[in-house]
C-alpha cells in the first residue's frame, strides 16, 4: 500500500489497496502541468518558425559540416547525403574510439553522443564498435559547425601516427 496514492486508489487496507475506477487509477500524484505548458509553448514556437524552415536549417548545417569535415584524414561519415538527413551526422575517425573523440570535443565546448546508440546490429554491419553522433537543430549555427570541425581536426592530429 505504501507505493500507491493520490486518486489512483479507492481504499487502502493494512495489507493491500484497491484501485480506483478509470481513468483515475492511472493518474497518480499531481499532474505534470508545468511540462504540459512548456510543451505547448515549444509547439507554438516551432509552428511560428515553420517545420520546413527548421528542416532546411538542419540540412544546411549538415551540408556545411559534411563539406568542412570531408578532408579530415581518417574521417568516415556514415549514412545518406546531407540532403536526405534531418539533423544527425554519424561519423568515425580512424584509430580514435568515439568515446575518446567525445571527450576531446567536450574540451572544445562541443557536446556529441558517442557509442552504439542502442543499434549494435548497425554497428556490426558498419564494422565499428561505435560511432560519434553530432546533432544540429534550430539553436545551432555556423559557429557550432566550426567548433565541431576544429575539435575533430584536433583529435585527428592528436591521434595521428608519429611523423604523419
Give the label of every model feature segment.
Residues 1-164:
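Pyridoxal 5′-phosphate
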Amino acid at each position: 500500500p505504501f507505493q500507491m496514492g493520490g486518486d489512483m486508489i479507492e481504499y487502502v487496507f493494512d495489507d493491500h489497496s484497491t484501485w480506483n475506477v478509470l481513468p483515475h487509477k492511472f493518474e497518480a500524484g499531481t499532474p505534470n502541468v508545468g511540462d504540459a505548458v512548456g510543451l505547448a509553448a515549444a509547439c507554438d514556437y516551432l509552428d511560428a518558425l515553420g517545420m520546413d524552415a527548421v528542416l532546411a536549417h538542419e540540412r544546411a548545417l549538415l551540408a556545411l559540416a559534411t563539406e568542412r569535415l570531408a578532408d579530415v584524414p581518417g574521417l568516415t561519415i556514415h549514412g545518406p547525403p546531407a540532403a536526405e538527413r534531418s539533423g544527425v551526422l554519424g561519423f568515425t575517425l580512424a584509430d580514435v574510439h568515439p568515446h575518446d573523440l567525445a571527450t576531446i570535443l567536450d574540451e572544445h565546448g562541443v557536446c556529441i553522443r558517442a557509442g552504439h546508440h542502442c543499434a549494435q546490429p548497425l554497428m556490426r554491419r558498419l564494422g565499428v564498435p561505435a560511432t560519434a553522433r553530432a546533432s544540429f537543430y534550430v539553436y545551432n549555427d555556423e559557429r557550432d559547425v566550426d567548433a565541431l570541425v576544429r575539435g575533430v581536426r584536433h583529435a585527428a592530429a592528436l591521434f595521428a601516427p608519429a611523423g604523419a
